[in-house]
Amino acid sequence: MTLRFGLELVDRLARPLLVIILTIVLIWKGPIFLPIAYSTSGPTILYPGLSFPASFRFAPDGRIFFTEKNTGNIRIIQNGTLVPSPFASLTVATDGLEQGLLGIALSPSFQSDGFVYVYYMGWDGTTYHGRIARFTALGNSGTGRVSIFDVADPTPSTTNHDGGYLRFGPDGKLYVQVGEFADPSQSQNSSSVAGKILRMNPDGTVPSDNPFPNSLVYALGIRNGFGMDFDGQTGQLVETEAGPDRDDEINLIVAGGNYGWPICMDTCSNPSFINPIASFAPVVTPSGIAYASPRRYYFGEWTSASLQKLTLTQSSTVASISQVWSSPNPYNGVTDVVLGPDQKIYFSTSTEIYQYDFSGSAEPTQPSSSWTVIYVAIAVAAVAIAIVLVVSRLRHQKTIDSGPNPLSSVFTFLAARVSG
């Protein structure tokens, strides 16, 4: 009696559950995708054995200029080979992990003026300085060094949060990420260039159309960023920013925008601050980011030693973030990401430069939450079907219906949805 009662109870619960789950599946308006195994060739190492390439850029003739973070050398790769002698060398402060020779940018008019810009941390005997030097390329040698920017670290005893990333915008201006030098109060200090994104003319002077009169400041409330790029269609500036022990961010930068640090992190209710489009917890330390195609970016992660793909919606919200590659060496984090002249993604780690042909690649991605619901629904429906069949058999009853088996119709429908 007890066994029979238990079987009847299971049968009564399983049948309504089956009806509910199958109803959800049947009214679903989108196609039903089943998980498949993706294959992709993945990134390949082009240049191994490098000395901590912090940032790199392509010249119009195909040469790659890159900074060696800890040596202070600017190096060139030409025709697939590292040029033996440095393009130029700087004396840099390397007392902290985040110091050294950092960002690099080539003039938009490089073919005519040969200008190469680098950001580095220097030491004057008492204070650390964030500096931008400009060289003129004469073949593979840098000449005519000129200093166009210098900011003294407001907290001389600190050696981190130096920023240092450089990027020329479609407007021909030089954009600079400057960290707050481990002094959070600098980010909201309008008279300081620390904790900001700066916008300057190629000679270091203030553009007349900057959002704050007579100031290099373009955006404030920045903690410490080392990655930014411009949307190739809209010109939108996108930057990555490292948080403290949580809330790393990806931000859409607008002129005069305030991004909240240190008053708030991640999403803020204060309308004075602009919220990130993505935040990460725990930290991943996002680094270089590159626009690849409409609404698609690739960015590096230092902490997780990986390359990620960011896809945006038409309204510039995050559609998905998925991992494309991770280093077998967890200490070989990604430092910079660049779209090459061949429309392939290039990225550097602490020892190599990689190439990734993302066009036509079937990249491994995580299913969206809506597809996850469908996967779970199908799985639960399968369990419910199994329960009904087992219970019916144990009770030695007749078939569910004297007519055509409804389960057969369901499986036929699902098969048609999947194949269509």
Where are these regions (language model features)?
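C-terminal membrane-anchoring or membrane-association module
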Residues: A386-G420
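Beta-propeller blade signature
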Residues: R131-G139, S190-P202, I253-V254
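Acidic, Gly/Ser/Thr-rich repeat motifs that build Ca2+-stabilized beta-propeller blades
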Residues: F33-P184, G227-F230, G235-G243, P282-S315, ...
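Short, conserved, GDST-rich strand-edge loop motifs in beta-rich repeat architectures
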Residues: V176-A194, D248-E249
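Surface-exposed loop and turn segments in beta-propeller and other repeat-based domains
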Residues: S85-L97, R145-T159, P202-Y218, G260-F280, ...
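Hydrophobic secretory-pathway targeting helix
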Residues: D11-L34
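Conserved blade-ending motifs and adjacent loop-strand segments that build the rim/top face
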Residues: A319-G340
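Juxtamembrane/start-of-transmembrane alpha-helix segments at the extracytoplasmic/lumenal side
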Residues: T365-A379
